[in-house]
C-alpha cells in the first residue's frame, strides 16, 4: 500500500511540471484613453452610468411637478369663477347702455389732404375671346358715311345707283323691294304716264311699263308711292361735279365683283323722297326740296352717248331746266350734309283699323239688344235665314263682338280672312308630360266636332233663366254670348252704317260658324257640395242641371216686364253625371 501511494505522488509531480512547461506567458492588456492623458475608458464608463441615473430621477421629478401644477390650476379656476361672471355681466350691461345712446361718427378728417385716400381707377375692359361661341365682330355704320365711302371707293366709273321702294303693301305689312336699275330718271305718281310720253322715249334705253303697279295701288287704302332715281353720266373727264353724289354708282365695278351694288336707305332718306299727302288729302307733292316739281309720268333721261351729256326726246321741252335740276340737286346735297331733318312720328304711315264704337247707356228693361247691336230683332232673323260663307277678303270688325273705347287703335291682321272672335278662357292649363292626370271616363263628355250642332242648341224656344237680373250694361253681352254658343250670330259688314246695311242684300252678309270646344285636356271635376246644400246670397241664382230648377235666394225678385225683349240664352253647364241615352 505504501508503494502505491508513493507512485501517485510521483505521477502528480511529473504532470505538474509538464503543465508549467506548456502554459504560454501572459501578455498585459494595453490601457485605452478616451481623452489622452486625461480620461481613460474605465472613467468614461463610470461617468455614463452616473448620467443615466440622473435622467431617471429628472423624469420622476417632472411628472410630479406637472401633477402638482394641474391641481393648483383647478383650485385657481374654482376661486375665479365668481369674479369672471361678474366682469362679463358688467361688460354686457355697459354695451347695452351704449346702444341706447348712439354716438355720432365724425368720419375721416381731412380726406383731401390724406395721401392714403384716392379715387379708384377705371377697371380695364376684359379681353374678348375670339374663340368664344358667338364672338363675331359686327360693324354698324350710318347711312351717310356708307354713301361717302361707297363713292370714294370707285370715283372714276360713276354711273348709277338703284334706290329702293319702301312702304309698299297692304294691311300691316311693310316691306322693301329692290328695284332694278333704269337708265332714266323717272318720277312716277298716280296717274300713270301717258302713251305719248312712252312713244317719245329716246335712245337712252327701254321704258318700263308702270300700269301694273298703278293698277295695284288703291287710292283709299294705304299710301303707295313709286319713286325711282338713276342718273347716267359721261366718263370721268367730262363728268359734271355738280351732280349729286348720292345718285351715282359704278355698275362696271359691281359686274367685275360678281354682285350688284346696293344699300338700304334710312328712314330719313325714304321719308324725304316719298310723296306725302297734303292737309286736304287730294293731291301728292314731293317732299324732296332738291328735285323740282315734275309732271306726273314725265321721263327725264341722261344718256351717255359720245362722251357728252344731252337730254332725250321725252324731255326736249325742259332742255333749259337741266342746269336748274343739277343746281337744286347740289343744293339738296349740301342741305342734307348740313342738317338731317328729324322724322315726325305723327306723319309716319301707320296701318291700323279704328273700329267705330258708339258708347251708349242701354236700357236693361226695354231694348238691351238694340242698344248693343244697333239693329232690330226682326231684321236679324231675316238676315239669318240665308247663310253664306265668308269670302277671302271679308273682314269682321271686332266691335261687333265686344265694345272698344274710342281712340284705341285695333291692328288688323292682313293674312287671309280676318275673322276675330273673343277669347274663351276656361282657366285651365294644358297638361304637360309630367302631369299625372287620370284617363277620362264616362263622366266626362265634350262637344262633338261635327259641323251639325245638336237640336238643343238650335232650338228656337230654349229655356230661359227665370227671374235673372243681369247687371246694368251687361244684358247685350249675355245675349251675344248665348247666340255665339247656339250658332245664330250674324255679323254685319265692317265700315257700313245702318242706312247702308239696310239697302244691301241680306244674303250677302257673312255668317259666322260658332267655335266648338275640343277635348284638349283631361279634367276631372267632382262637386264638393250638393246644390241643395248651398245657401245663396240675396240676388244670386244658380241653375241645377240635374233637377232643371233654378235655385235662388229667399229674397223675392221682381218679374220681367211684358215689353222686355230679353234674348234666349242657352246654358250648358259641366256634366256631373253619366249622359243619358236619347
From Swiss-Prot:
- Keyword Signal listed: no
Mind listing the UniProt keywords for this protein, alphabetically?
Phosphoprotein
User: Phosphoserine occurs at which residues?
Assistant: 242
At the top level, the lineage of the source is Eukaryota
Question: Where is this chain compositionally biased, Polar residues type?
Answer: 311-320
Which intervals carry biased composition (Basic and acidic residues)? 1-23
* Parts forming coiled coils: none
User: Which Pfam families does UniProt cross-reference here?
Assistant: DUF4639
Under InterPro entries, the record lists: DUF4639
Q: Region (Disordered): which ranges?
A: 1-29, 110-133, 147-221, 310-331, 551-582
This chain's protein is named: Uncharacterized protein C2orf81
What organism is listed for this UniProt entry? Homo sapiens (Human)
Amino acid at each position: 500500500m505504501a508503494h502505491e501511494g508513493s507512485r501517485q505522488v510521483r505521477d502528480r509531480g511529473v504532470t505538474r511540471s509538464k503543465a508549467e512547461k506548456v502554459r504560454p506567458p501572459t501578455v498585459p492588456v494595453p490601457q485605452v484613453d478616451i481623452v489622452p492623458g486625461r480620461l481613460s475608458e474605465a472613467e468614461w464608463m463610470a461617468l455614463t452610468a452616473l448620467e443615466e441615473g440622473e435622467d431617471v430621477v429628472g423624469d420622476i421629478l417632472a411628472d410630479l411637478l406637472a401633477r402638482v401644477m394641474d391641481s393648483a390650476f383647478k383650485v385657481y379656476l374654482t376661486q375665479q369663477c365668481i369674479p369672471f361672471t361678474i366682469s362679463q355681466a358688467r361688460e354686457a350691461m355697459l354695451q347695452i347702455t351704449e346702444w341706447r345712446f348712439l354716438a355720432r361718427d365724425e368720419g375721416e378728417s381731412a380726406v383731401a389732404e390724406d395721401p392714403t385716400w384716392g379715387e379708384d381707377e377705371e377697371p380695364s375692359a376684359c379681353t374678348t375671346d375670339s374663340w368664344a361661341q358667338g364672338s363675331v365682330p359686327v360693324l354698324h355704320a350710318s347711312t351717310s358715311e356708307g354713301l361717302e365711302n361707297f363713292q370714294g371707293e370707285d370715283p372714276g366709273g360713276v354711273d348709277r345707283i338703284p334706290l329702293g321702294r319702301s312702304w309698299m303693301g297692304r294691311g300691316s305689312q311693310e316691306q322693301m323691294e329692290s328695284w332694278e336699275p333704269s337708265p332714266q330718271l323717272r318720277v312716277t305718281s298716280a296717274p300713270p304716264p301717258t302713251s305719248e310720253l312712252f312713244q317719245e322715249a329716246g335712245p337712252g334705253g327701254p321704258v318700263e311699263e308702270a300700269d301694273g303697279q298703278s293698277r295695284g295701288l288703291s287710292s283709299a287704302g294705304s299710301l303707295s308711292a313709286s319713286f325711282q332715281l338713276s342718273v347716267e353720266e359721261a366718263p370721268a373727264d367730262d363728268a359734271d361735279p355738280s351732280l349729286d353724289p348720292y345718285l351715282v354708282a359704278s355698275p362696271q365695278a359691281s359686274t367685275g365683283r360678281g354682285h350688284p351694288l346696293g344699300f338700304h336707305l334710312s328712314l330719313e332718306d325714304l321719308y324725304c323722297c316719298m310723296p306725302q299727302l297734303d292737309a286736304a288729302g287730294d293731291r301728292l307733292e314731293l317732299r324732296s326740296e332738291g328735285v323740282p316739281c315734275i309732271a306726273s309720268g314725265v321721263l327725264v333721261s341722261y344718256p351717255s352717248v359720245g362722251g357728252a351729256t344731252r337730254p332725250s326726246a321725252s324731255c326736249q321741252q325742259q332742255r333749259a331746266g337741266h342746269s336748274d335740276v343739277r343746281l337744286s340737286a347740289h343744293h339738296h346735297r349740301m342741305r342734307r350734309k348740313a342738317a338731317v331733318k328729324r322724322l315726325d312720328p305723327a306723319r309716319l304711315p301707320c296701318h291700323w283699323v279704328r273700329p267705330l264704337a258708339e258708347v251708349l247707356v242701354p236700357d236693361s228693361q226695354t231694348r238691351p239688344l238694340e242698344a248693343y247691336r244697333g239693329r232690330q230683332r226682326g231684321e236679324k232673323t231675316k238676315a239669318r235665314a240665308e247663310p253664306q260663307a265668308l269670302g277671302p277678303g271679308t273682314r269682321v270688325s271686332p266691335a261687333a263682338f265686344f265694345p272698344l273705347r274710342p281712340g284705341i287703335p285695333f291692328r288688323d291682321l292682313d293674312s287671309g280672312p280676318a275673322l276675330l272672335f273673343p277669347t274663351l278662357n276656361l282657366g285651365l292649363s294644358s297638361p304637360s308630360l309630367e302631369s299625372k292626370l287620370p284617363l277620362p271616363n264616362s263622366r266626362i263628355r265634350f262637344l262633338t266636332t261635327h259641323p251639325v250642332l245638336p237640336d238643343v242648341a238650335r232650338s228656337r224656344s230654349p229655356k230661359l233663366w227665370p227671374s235673372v237680373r243681369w247687371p246694368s250694361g251687361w244684358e247685350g253681352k249675355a245675349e251675344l254670348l248665348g247666340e255665339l254658343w247656339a250658332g245664330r250670330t250674324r255679323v254685319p259688314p265692317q265700315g257700313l252704317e245702318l242706312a247702308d246695311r239696310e239697302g244691301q242684300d241680306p244674303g250677302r252678309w257673312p255668317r259666322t260658324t260658332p267655335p266648338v270646344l275640343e277635348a284638349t285636356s283631361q279634367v276631372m271635376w267632382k262637386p264638393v257640395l250638393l246644390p241643395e246644400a248651398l245657401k245663396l246670397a240675396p240676388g244670386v241664382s244658380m241653375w241645377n242641371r240635374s233637377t232643371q230648377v233654378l235655385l235662388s235666394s229667399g229674397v223675392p225678385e221682381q218679374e220681367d216686364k211684358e215689353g222686355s225683349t230679353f234674348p234666349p240664352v242657352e246654358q250648358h253647364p259641366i256634366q256631373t253625371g253619366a249622359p243619358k241615352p236619347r
